Curated annotation (Swiss-Prot):
This is Translation initiation factor 2 subunit alpha. The keyword Protein biosynthesis applies. Residues 15-86 form the S1 motif domain. GO terms for molecular function: ribosome binding; RNA binding; translation initiation factor activity. InterPro entries: NA-bd_OB-fold, S1_domain, S1_IF2_alpha, TIF2_asu_arc, TIF2_asu_C, TIF2_asu_middle_sf, TIF_2_asu. It comes from Methanothermobacter thermautotrophicus (strain ATCC 29096 / DSM 1053 / JCM 10044 / NBRC 100330 / Delta H). Belongs to the eIF-2-alpha family.
Length: 262
């Protein structure tokens, strides 16, 4: 099923980047439906198709082609939107398409959340969708926040509790929080006859907690923690380092935790 990501405003603004699908190509220009503005179309004059000379417009645009264009003029009274394909850098074009695709995914999430409440997508937009876009910048940002921080983060922003609950449920089911990796170091020394075994035991205590241990050069060892929660990763790193140090110190050795090397 195709999802049309919507904007709160009925018409785009001048200077805005829009995504369109070309549906008609003529000798003097092309028409494209605006994917984010239901029922609206834009006109691309042949002079705005490419920065180079355009002998045949069909060498640059074709029916059903997805395009990114910059809005030049908007006339709601006449129903006209004029856009340019040439007044965009390639990196802007790429970012816009990527953002649009992500928002398509978020709109699917919104529909799933609405379904859990027995509502349709139109109702979802009116009751909470546009509000989420105002608060978080876009729909996906709202679902990402819900996945990472829970429904309380939505409720605190004024999102109704019933919507916050289903949005969070859908978000946690479909979005994996990005993984972070943090690194710390322990310098541990043992003066006991069985010092090697003591050091090995200390480092194994960190490995048993799921931490990667790497030798930098005795007496220094690198501890690496991976997690989807930065604060939990920091806590895990410090606790593991402290445990290593305690094991060594208990046997008459010494140790030090270094969060960063200077």
């Amino acid at each position: 099923m195709f999802f049309m990501v919507r904007r709160k405003n009925e018409w785009p603004e001048e200077g805005e980047l829009v995504v369109g699908t070309v549906h008609k190509v003529l000798n003097y220009g092309a028409f494209a439906t605006l994917e984010e503005y239901p029922g609206k179309e834009a006109f691309i004059h042949i002079s705005e198709v490419s920065s180079g000379w355009v002998k045949n417009i069909r060498d640059f645009v074709r029916e059903n082609q997805k395009i990114v264009a910059r809005v030049l003029r908007v006339n709601p009274r006449k129903g006209h939107v004029d856009v340019s394909m040439k007044r965009i850098r390639e990196d802007q074009r790429t970012k816009k398409i990527q953002a649009w695709k992500i928002e398509q995914k978020a709109e699917k999430f919104l529909e799933l959340a609405a379904r859990d409440l027995g509502k349709d997508l139109d109702t979802a937009y009116e009751e909470v969708g546009y509000e989420l876009m105002d608060i978080f910048g876009d729909l996906y940002g709202a679902f990402e926040t819900a996945a990472e921080e829970g429904e309380k983060s939505l409720i605190e922003e004024g999102v109704p509790e019933d919507w916050a609950a289903v949005i969070t449920e859908v978000a946690k089911r479909n979005i994996t929080p990005p993984e972070v990796q943090i690194t710390g170091y322990v310098d541990i020394k043992s003066y006991a006859p069985n010092g090697v075994e003591i050091i090995r035991k200390a480092l194994k205590s960190a490995q048993d907690e799921g931490i990667t241990v790497q030798a930098v050069g005795a007496p220094r060892y690198r501890l690496i923690v991976k997690s989807t929660d930065y604060l939990k990763a920091e806590k895990q790193l410090k606790e593991a380092a402290q445990k290593c140090i305690e094991i060594v110190e208990k046997e008459g050795g010494e140790g030090e935790f270094l969060r960063e090397l200077t």
